[in-house]
Amino acid sequence: MEYGLDLEYSFNEFFKGFGLSSEIAHIIWLPIPMLLVLVAAVVGVLVTVWLERKISAAAQQRIGPEYAGALGVLQPIADGLKLLVKEDIIPAKADGILFTAGPILVLVPVILSWLIVPFGQNLLISNVGIGIFLWIALSSIQPIGLLMSGYASNNKYSLLGGLRAAAQSISYEIPLALSVLAIVLMTNSLSTIDIVNQQSGAGILSWNIWRQPVGFIVFWICALAECERLPFDLPEAEEELVAGYQTEYAGMKFALFYLGSYINLILSALLVSILYLGGWGFPIPVELIAKFLHLPINAPVIQVFTASIGIVMTVLKAYLLVFIAILLRWTTPRVRIDQLLDLGWKFLLPISLANLLITAGLKLAFPQFFGG
């Protein structure tokens, strides 16, 4: 779908109506996209935490949060405020600088990765040509922060958790990147906008999940491992490592780990939606909607409606995957560290490599179905 609302253009036009120049309007606009990302990420975390509490309660035949607002919807806010006012303790023998920098280095790359997530044709912060490659590069920074946090804590459980996190991330980063390369090969572009547009030809049948079922499965497994979700939560296994690299953290620093974990889960689900499930695309062509309403295709009403539907479709697809991830947490046992590494190196890596080679062959043989 090639139509949509351009927020920056609309914002500039709005301020031009007050007599401001386009340069001043652009300067005013600069911090707004990042604020929108932060608000969207925090709201997404609050919704996900509430969903996880309710789903886990249902899995264990409990009621779950009930008293903090209707159906307990304010419970995540109460949890956040509790962590915010807790004392920030740095262990006496810890490396204070690295101890403080670790959580920041974990959270910042995840936040920056949202820059390339599109919710519509023009609804993204930065349409860089190397969008998906930028995400892979940013995601490779996070293990450094985890290892740094484990090392700086001067605690054996923290160090072991940090080492596990680094080993796990390295093991699953490669098959994840190879599965993404298969999509890039079909699309001939690293732009997330181009990847979604390439899936808009024949509705749901154009989604990459039908042409890349193996890549979809590999990507989702690797994404869960990158997010350290059960059954891949070895770096913070409570029964073995207390809380892993988070053991010595409290207050706001611990909240940064907590926030980063859930933002990363939502980001991974959004990227699966974009890469494999058509992103913001929906079955009814925008031309038919405009014709039904007797409006031109570029009418403001059509643009706002298209943008709204695109956001809803992207978020719904992502939260379907978040729901699956939460269910997996309460229905699957934790694997051993050797099993986790074997799965990454001995199974997912060769499978993703074979999938990439097969995709290249199919593209040469059937360019009309696998990209021209």
UniProtKB/Swiss-Prot annotation:
Record membrane topology:
Multi-pass membrane protein
Location within or outside the cell? Cellular thylakoid membrane
This chain's protein is named: NAD(P)H-quinone oxidoreductase subunit 1
Reaction equation(s) it catalyzes:
a plastoquinone + NADH + (n+1) H(+)(in) = a plastoquinol + NAD(+) + n H(+)(out); a plastoquinone + NADPH + (n+1) H(+)(in) = a plastoquinol + NADP(+) + n H(+)(out)
Q: Which GO terms describe its biological process?
A: aerobic respiration; photosynthesis, light reaction
Species annotation: Prochlorococcus marinus (strain MIT 9312)
Q: How does it assemble?
A: NDH-1 is composed of at least 11 different subunits.
**One Pfam annotation, family name?**
NADHdh
This protein's GO cellular component annotations are:
plasma membrane-derived thylakoid membrane
Using the UniProt record, name the top-level EC class of this enzyme in a single word. Answer: translocase
**What keywords tag this UniProt record?**
Membrane, NAD, NADP, Plastoquinone, Quinone, Thylakoid, Translocase, Transmembrane, Transmembrane helix
Family annotation (HAMAP family) = NDH1_NuoH
Q: Does the keyword tRNA processing apply?
A: no
